[in-house]
Amino acid sequence: MPEITVRAKSKTYPVYINEFALEDVREKWTESLAKFSHVFVLTDEHVAELHQAKLDAVLADLPVVTYYVAPNGEEAKTFRVYEDVMTKLIETGLDRKAVLIAFGGGVIGDLGGFVAATYMRGIPFYQVPTTVLAHDSAVGGKVAINHPLGKNMIGNFYQPEAVIYDTQFFATLPEREMRSGFAEMIKHALISDQTLLRALMDTFTEPKDFYTKDLTPFLQRGIEIKANIVAQDETEQGVRAYLNFGHTFGHALEAYGNFGKWLHGEAITYGMIYALTMSETIYGLDFDLAEFKTWLKQLGYDTTFDATVPFNKILENMRHDKKTTFNEISMVLLEEIGEPVIFKAEDDLIFETYKRVMRNGGNGI
């Protein structure tokens, strides 16, 4: 089975990825899980309905397994749900020899990792992603919940014991969710690998390709790109910030939409267009943005911007970005495809770029 090793400073662990990953690692994994006092599975309503039976079959021989089913979507990454999960852990009597399994998409991985990092100052956990988007979020140890004023503002760096990535789960993903996750694959290509970007553009030309073409080699390459960056900079003191390409504007947009109007990948797509536009202005980026947007539209992305989204709200939210220091907004831009750089952006430039993308778009947002 394809296996990628993540070598973070705090921990080295495997990422198992293929169409039958759960079954392939079943014996080895359950032997490891049997050493823990209790297995606590955190999932959401949608994943529980569709896939809990499959995980139940894998965990059937373990003596003590407890489930917590969180709400769907970003609602799960709130103080209220976090507190409720903690209450469940305490009431169930989990000790420091317990283990948590985050079984779901990126939201569940973020919440589950943060719960594991903070319960009794830390218990082990496994990531079992079920979405394309989670190929990014499940790897690297960033775990967090949201605050109404900003996405992922309360969090930690806490690595899993392993990531078990069974791509069979993709078959039940709605097209919108597939597209959202694919945006992070595009991001990895833009910041690191022009050849990968061209391969994505040549291979995936319409929405049905998400289901009929093999995503696995592209997911593997994206995970390898992220693993390489995490190995250099686990806690985002330097190059790991490059993984936030498109996220400064994208997270601001998500916050404006109360973390529900746009899926994460949808907001990040707008953010990447915004960052590419600013990169043209600052670095003269040689990139056919019109061709890129046409390709995105063919895949079903909405690439147009709506001037009714108030700039002052976006700017305010951008100031809450984790890269902002001394009230200076940091953008991840590209000097060339595959050559990211951190740039301190003045408010005037942020506004001029905002006006430019608005002129080039219609009523999309």
UniProtKB/Swiss-Prot annotation:
Q: What main location does UniProt list?
A: cytoplasm
Top-level EC class as recorded in UniProt: lyase
**Keywords, sorted A to Z:** Amino-acid biosynthesis, Aromatic amino acid biosynthesis, Cobalt, Cytoplasm, Lyase, Metal-binding, NAD, Nucleotide-binding, Zinc
A Gene Ontology cellular component where this protein is annotated is:
cytoplasm
In what pathway does it function? Metabolic intermediate biosynthesis; chorismate biosynthesis; chorismate from D-erythrose 4-phosphate and phosphoenolpyruvate: step 2/7
**The EC number(s) this enzyme carries:** 4.2.3.4
> What does the note under cofactor report?
Binds 1 divalent metal cation per subunit. Can use either Co(2+) or Zn(2+).
Q: Which GO terms describe its molecular function?
A: 3-dehydroquinate synthase activity; metal ion binding; nucleotide binding
Locate the residues binding Zn(2+).
E184, H247, H264
Pfam family membership, one? DHQS_C
Q: Which InterPro entries match?
A: Dehydroquinate_synthase, DHQ_synth_AroB, DHQ_synth_fam, DHQS/DOIS_N, DHQS_C
List localization entries. Cytoplasm
| Positions of disulphide bridges | none
Q: Which Gene Ontology BP annotations are present?
A: amino acid biosynthetic process; aromatic amino acid family biosynthetic process; chorismate biosynthetic process
Binding positions for NAD(+)? Answer: G106, V107, I108, G109, D110, T130, T131, K142, K151, F169, F170, A171, T172
Write down the chemical reaction(s) this protein catalyses: 7-phospho-2-dehydro-3-deoxy-D-arabino-heptonate = 3-dehydroquinate + phosphate
- Cofactor(s) listed in the protein's UniProt record: NAD(+); Co(2+); Zn(2+)
Stored PANTHER family: 3-DEHYDROQUINATE SYNTHASE, 3-DEHYDROQUINATE SYNTHASE, CHLOROPLASTIC
Main role?
Catalyzes the conversion of 3-deoxy-D-arabino-heptulosonate 7-phosphate (DAHP) to dehydroquinate (DHQ).
Q: Which family does it belong to?
A: Belongs to the sugar phosphate cyclases superfamily. Dehydroquinate synthase family.
What is the protein named? 3-dehydroquinate synthase
